[in-house]
Structure formats: C-alpha cells, structure tokens
C-alpha cells in the first residue's frame, strides 16, 4: 500500500488522497463497514487499547502487581496468554478475596477523561457497543454526545434494559464496587463464564450472530481476540460474516501474517500501512482509520462518474426485483442523503460529500458526458435511468420547471380485469414470480384457501431458490390472507344468517384448524428483523410492511396535510409550489401503485379503506373550496382561473372501491359533485361495464363465490351509485341498467334502492328509448311475479315499481307499454294482486287496457286514493276523498294511543300523516277536522298549526325533501319564517351540508 505524508496537505484532502490510493480490499472493507453503519448493523467490539489512550491502567500492569505481591518482584519478560489469567487466579487462591479486591481498588480507582476515539466510534452510529473494558469512559462519551445506550454489565441489567441499543460490558465493571465478583479477570472467571453470565453471554452471541463486528483496541495476539473470533465463527456458521480488525501497531503487518488471519476469518485494516507516524503515536493511527470510516460514511470519496454510477447502482439494483417503489422510501436507500419528493423531484438533505444524484441527472441530460462512460457503466446507467423513469423520479428539485406528473397503475387487480386474472392463473407458471402473482390474483377472486396454500408453497420454494424478496412478501401476504379469513369467518358466523339466509361456511373446519396451527405465534412485527442481514441491507424500504400499522406514517402525514389544507381554506390563502392537496394525491397514488403492482394484499382492511377515503375526501373538499371562493386580484394576477381539479378514472375507481354509499352521500351533502368535471369518461365507462358484466356472470350461474361476492358487492354498489356523474354510451348504459335491474341481489339492493340508482343514472344520460325498453321488461317481470297472491315488493325507502313507471313518463310522456297492456287486457277479477300492481302503472297502459283495468278497480281505501293521485287519475279532492283521509287519521289516532301505551312511538314507511299535513298547509284539503289529529306526528303539527308548533321539535332535514312551491309557502308564513331561518343559520354554521345554504339563500333571504 502507498503511504501518504499526513503533514503535507489539509487533513480532509489528505484523507481523500489516502482513500484514492488504498488497496481495493481495504476500500471494500471501509465500504462494508459504512454500509453496516447506515443499515443499523454495525457493532464495535472495544478493547483495552482504546482506554489506554486515556491513560487508563493497563491489564498487564495489574497482572504485574499480582505477580509482585506473590513472588516479590515483577516477572522478567512478557506474560503468555495463559499467565494473564493464571496469575490473578493463583493470587486469589493464595491471598484470598479481600487482598484480591484491595489491589483492584488501588489499581482501578482513577478518574480519566474520554479521548477522541470514543467520539469517533460513536460518530459511526453503532447499533451496539461491546467491550471487555471495565472503565466508564465509553459510557461517559455516550452521555456527552447524547447517545443513549442501556449499560449492561451484570445479569440483572439485561431484564432492566430501557433502550434497544446496548453498551454490553461482557467482563463487567466497577459500578457496584471494586470487587472481583463484579468483573471477569482470573482463570475461573473465563472457564465458568457461560455458567456465571448466561444472559449476557446469550445476548452477546445474538448480537454477534446478526451484526457486522469491528474489533478495535485489541492486539492480534490478545487472548480475548482469539477466543472472540472463534465465537463469531461458531455463531455465524455457514453465513460467517467475517469481522473486521483495526490494527494500530507501529509497523505495517507482514503479508504472511495478514494471509494467516484472513484465513482465520479476520479482515484487517492496518493503520501503519496507511500512514507514517511516530512509533508511540497510537492516537494518530487510530484516528487515521476512524476518520477514513467517517469520511467514507459521508460519501466524500465519490468523485468520478464511474464511482457515481457504481454507488447508485449498488444501492438501487436490489430494488429491480420490485415492480414499483414509493418515492418517499428512497430516502432510506440513500440514508437520508436526499429526500425524494412525491412529485418526482430530488432534494439534497444530509449529504455533505459529493453530489452524486446531481451528477447522475447531469449525465442524464448530457449525451456527450454519457458517451465517456465504459460499456459496463453505460449499461448500469441505462438500468438506473429506466428504474427512475418507471418509478417517476424525474430530476433535482432545483432544476424542475413545470412538472406534469402522470398517474398510471398497471395492475390487473386494480382495474378489475377478473377474466384476464383467471386466464393467467390457469396458464403454466414460468417462474416463482408467476406463482406469487397467481396467489395474489386468487385472493382478489375470493379464492382465499387456494391463495393461502399457494403462498405456503411459494415460501418453501423461495427458500430453495434463495429468493428472499418473494419469500418475505409471501410471508406478509399469507399472514394478511390469514387475517382476512379469520375476519370472514367471524362475519359469516355473525351475519351470514341475516345476509344469506343460512349460516355460510366458505372454509372447511380442517382448513381453519390447519391455518390456525400454522399461524399461531407468528408475529409479523418480527419478520423483517428475522430476515438475513444481506436482505435487510438491500430491502430496508420494505421494513414498514412488517408492521400491522404499515400506513401509519402516511396517515399521520395525511392528518398534517389535512390541517394545512383546511388552514389555507379558512385563511383564504394561496399555495405556491406544490400545494398540500397535490401532495395528498401523489402520496395516495404512490401507495396504491406500490401495493397493487407488487401484489400486496391489503384491500380487505379497514385502515387501508379509511386512508383512501380520507385522502379523496380532502381532495374533493379542497376542490369545492376552490370552486366557490371569490378570486381576488392576487388570484387573477397569478392564477387567472380557479382550481383545475377534475375527477379522473383513478379517482373514480378509488371512490367506488373504498367509499360506502353513506360516504358518497356525505360528499354530496358537503360538495357540489355535479360541478366537478369528470374526465376519462370512456375509461370510467369501461370500468363500470366491467362491473356490470361481472355482476351478470356471478348471478347468472350457480355456485357463486360468496367470499368474492362480499368483497366485490360493496364496490359494485358504490360504483353504480357514483356513476350518476358520468356520461355513458347508450350501449354501456344498457348493460349497466340490465345488471342493476335483473341481476343485482335483492338483499343488497331492494326495488326501492334500485330505483334510486337508476334515477341517478338519468342525470347525465337521461332515458334513451333502449333503456326505457329494459325498464319495461323489468316491469313486465314484476307484473308476472304478482300472479302469486303472496308476493309483495320489498322496499326500504317507499319507492316501488310505480315509481319506475313515473320515471319513464317523465322522459317519454307518450310511452305506452305494449306488453303491460297485453297483460292487463288478460286480467280477470280473481287476479286482484296483479290488478292492484298494474293500477299503479296505469299511465303506461293503452286506452283499452286502462278501461279494462278500471272495470275491476275503484278508489275504496286510502292506498287506492294515494295511488290514484300518483298516477294522475285523481286531480282534485272530492268530499269522498277527504272522508277517506279523515277515516285514515282517525284510525291512525286510535292506533297511536294503543302504540303509545305499549311504548311504540314510530310510524311505518307507509304513514301518510306528514303528506296530509302538507296538503292542508297548501290548502288542497280544507277539512276543519284536520286540527283534531295534532300531537301524533311533529311534521304534521308543523304544517297544520305553525303558530303553536314547538320549534324545538323541528328537524332541519325535512326542508331538503320539499319542493319549490312548498319552500316558498313556508318562507311566506309569518309564524314559520323566523324560526326556520334561525335553524338554517345554525346548520350552515355547524354542518358541511351545502343544501342548507342553498335553501337559505334561495327562499329565505
């Protein structure tokens, strides 16, 4: 090796020159040590030589003292390794414990300062420090630098450790007094070490087996070093990770000696081979090595383009096995030298050395500079270029202009391509990666038992193939499938009878018993730390998956961004640069793409759905704010127009997949979704049609997969509900309406809810004739069902087939149903169920059919009256009609008294009291007896006697159901107006429901 005069140049430049002239083996040693430091796997094993730099008493002098007390004089010549242990043992046996302890106290009761090497050791950020020294110098250095380690020098300290970092004093110390029982010194102490210190011994062995060890402060002939080296080799066995040894002898090591120790598994960094120094200047030699390590840790020795490419490639190439990575996780790969922003820009952070990422992007922009790279480096550069491009890493932030960040997820599962997934599963696997993808697709298709078993096989096969990445991800996915299965079993046991009409068991008892046995005591939190060291080093960014709260950091960040966005909204401020809502959007899609493209199972977990819901809700809330706020001069000057937010395909899918119907309703109450532009409508339609076709397939055939059904049906309901805002082709709309009316399970959407979904679809699409024909087919089917005298339509919202007829008439006033008319013309008096049903659809019938039907039907009860009004058969109330209403109210009053006595105070969905109250208020009914029925229904009372009504009982949501005529009449009523205005003001202030503001502004102000 070439020596450099350290006195000739500035120290930093000298170190760089030393580094550039180092032997390649030493360079690799330095790189590996600094890499271990960055990965939290570095352990320094500190010997007496480091304490000697602080003038702490040396061990051989203590042995000399014992020898002199025994034999009257110091030993002539050097002690052998055995004598270092035997002489203290002889003294203890001959002179006794008290004399032995007395010499210890006299010898070691000193106060010495720490030295620079203690600080330099800690500057390398070791995970643990192990030492055979008795002193407290390293303890003191830790406290000075704010590094907290649990000091363990006795057995009881192990259980009382308060930090995950240990300062392990394997030979004890004198914190509990200068007694031989507190330290390892004499021969018996060494021979009985494992027996006397089992906890410390096991802890040390565990650390040694899983970390990179650097010995410092020892001599190659030291008894401790030979014993410890044998331990390391024994513990690490086949995966023996050769420890490092910092040698600080004055003269360079002989080549034969170097080879000898390398064959024993010790990698030596020889200070004397690096620098010329005074024979007695051990501090300078220690410092030379430690400073090289520290400077290398800060990338100060990277200068050439080849080194830049090699360094980045070494960090990134293990990640080529992943289909996508989250940009924010790259900071872990580069030890926080840079931050990788979600918009694809890179920001220098902790890097104090050469700007290697800056240089990479300079090479990216310069063909001339790239052409100077060697063939190997050019290939590596292209591999890195492709990796960064695929993962959306674009440029340094300082060089970024206007960025158009595109969003693209290439997962079949994300896009709901179920048929393509099934086809892939049936094909022959070429690699273990194919099997891994198949297991994920099986899970997405609800075939969880098959998925679990395939993951189990992959785990075994990946061990044989040494494919750590597939092994780790399969372990995580298998565990999460297991969680999904246990949740499903609980759900089916508790709700299966209500949902499916019977207790449904999608998994056999044998399978459940087996997976319970296999997963008992499996702790996902321990998975990453249990992986081989090399895997942990390469895939640090995957550690967060080995955690039940793997979205925790993003959830916290989302909370911060939510507060920031809402603060901006409340203050009316403008964001410059990348706004908080854009950060939310990009982080959201980074997470989605990472999870889906790497086939990570997470879609059945509440936390994941909640994270998506919160993110999307925030984006829409911000868009509503941007749409409705006034643009001031600043806005015109800098922006010129309001927010350009629009709903893309991916946004639509995320809302469909992760929002419940109530969540969408909440959005609609707080934001004008209809004012948001919906882009990529063809892609959205393809997605919606795919859902419709899947519903049709699932419920056209026997043997429906109930597990798939439970995870798919919520998405289907939300997607078709949210489709209100999408302009569809007539063909696509037809497929959706058919699936909705003929194939959607009654238990999920009864006839009333299906009407709501259908009516919403007309907002952007109206009701083309082809769709009217589909609805007509549906009504014919319903008419045929009513042949059964026991059949009744089930509705949870008071909407029935009659409302479908009204919807048709709204869009096609002259529509006549030929088939319904034919059924009607075939009616006979005994088919009363069909007569009642078709009476409600009277407007859709031909003139002859109407006449024929009315020959069987007259207005005989309140339901006939209400149906007659709905279908337009009754335009004005006759005295006979009012008598029917009064009879109904009298019956209702009697029932009310009985129900009240029984503790029942609710009305059925078919109760007409509030409707009759409204008609009385609008003077469509003038019967004075109406006031006799006050006290049964608050809404009825509000309209019949507004002057004396108790407005504490007024429910604001009533107003949202009233039409323009009724709201106008309320606003003109002197008894109602003031009270209603106060209620509306309170709702505007304390709720996000924009409808209250619209009612207040449009009718009352």
Swiss-Prot record:
One of its GO terms (molecular function) is hydrolase activity. The keyword Transferase does not apply. Changing residue 135 to A: Decreases the NADase activity in presence of the phage tail tube protein. One of its GO terms (biological process) is defense response to virus. Residues 296-548 are annotated as: MID. Changing residue 71 to A: Drastic loss of tetramerization and NADase activity. The keyword Ribonucleoprotein does not apply. Residues 56-111 are annotated as: Inter-dimer interaction. (Microbial infection) NADase activity is activated through the binding of SPR phage tail tube monomer protein. NADase activity is inhibited through the binding to the phage SPbeta DSR anti-defense 1 (DSAD1). Its EC number is 3.2.2.5. The record marks 574, 576, 918-919, 922, 962, 966 as: Interaction with phage SPR tail tube monomeric protein. Residues 549-1005 are annotated as: CTD. Keywords: Antiviral defense, Host-virus interaction, Hydrolase. It holds the Pfam family SIR2_2. InterPro entries: DHS-like_NAD/FAD-binding_dom (IPR029035). The record marks 918-919, 922, 966 as: Interaction with phage SPbeta DSAD1. Residues 1-295 are annotated as: SIR2. The record marks 31-32, 50-52, 204, 206, 495, 497-498 as: Interaction with the phage SPR tail tube monomeric protein. It comes from the Bacteria. It catalyses: NAD(+) + H2O = ADP-D-ribose + nicotinamide + H(+). The active site is at 134, 135, 171. The N-terminus SIR2 domain serves as an NADase effector responsible for NAD+ hydrolysis and is necessary for tetramerization. The C-termius domain (CTD) functions as a sensor for detecting invading phages. The middle domain (MID) connects the SIR2 effector and the CTD sensor. Bacillus subtilis 29R7-12 has been isolated from the deep subsurface about 2.4 km below the ocean floor. Homotetramer (dimer of dimers). Homodimer. The SIR2 domains are arranged in a central core, adopting a head-to-head arrangement, while the CTDs are positioned at the periphery of the complex. Tetramerization is necessary for the activation of NADase activity. The NADase enzymatic activity of this homotetrameric form is autoinhibited. The activated form of DSR2 (after binding to the phage tube protein) exists as tetramers and dimers, with the tetramers exhibiting more NADase activity. Each tetramer binds 4 NAD(+) molecules. This is Defense-associated sirtuin 2. The lineage of its organism: Bacteria, Bacillati, Bacillota, Bacilli, Bacillales.
